[in-house]
Amino acid sequence: MRKLVIIPTYNEKENISAMIDKVFSLPEPFELLVIDDGSPDGTAEIVRQRRKEFPETLHLLERSGKQGLGTAYLTGFRWGLDNGFDYICEMDCDFSHNPDDLVRLYEAAAEGNDVVVGSRYVQGVNVVNWPMSRLLMSYFASMYVRIVTRMPLRDATAGFVCYSRHALETLDLDAVRMKGCLLYTSDAA
């Protein structure tokens, strides 16, 4: 089974190399697709250099200008499907998601779950590098989504998700709109 991790970046030169090392040190083999939105800090150049070490498993898509997280994920989903991946995961580069948990996300998806959402709030709060205001906004937004949708999601704004190929092929990605971590579909006729 081929597994891809999509990591959108913008000014992540302080984190990208450590993230690459961490993902490629996991006991499960993952390929990594970095989608950089024209980072002025040189993030893409670091990835280009690191591709010399991982030419078959580290991929880079460079986009001009800051086009946004949602469109980066959609671009990554299309790229992953076009390149034959069976599972496609998404995560942030700033280590607010623990890369070690990629293995657990994949294993849960491989058990027959089409979408597996990682949570920072299952056992207390597991978030680093966030100001309290952002943490509270995320926590209460997730609580709101859980109440309104009656879905047992602990972290609706996680952005740490593993999708099966089947789940993504079921969506019309051209009709999907994403704003940050929120995914919208359209049935416009």
Language-model features: locations:
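Acidic helix N-cap motif at the loop->helix transition within catalytic regions
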Residues: 17-18, 41-50
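Donor nucleotide-sugar binding loop of glycosyltransferases
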Residues: 12-15, 39, 98
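Short, well-formed alpha-helical segments that are part of the catalytic scaffolds
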Residues: 12-25
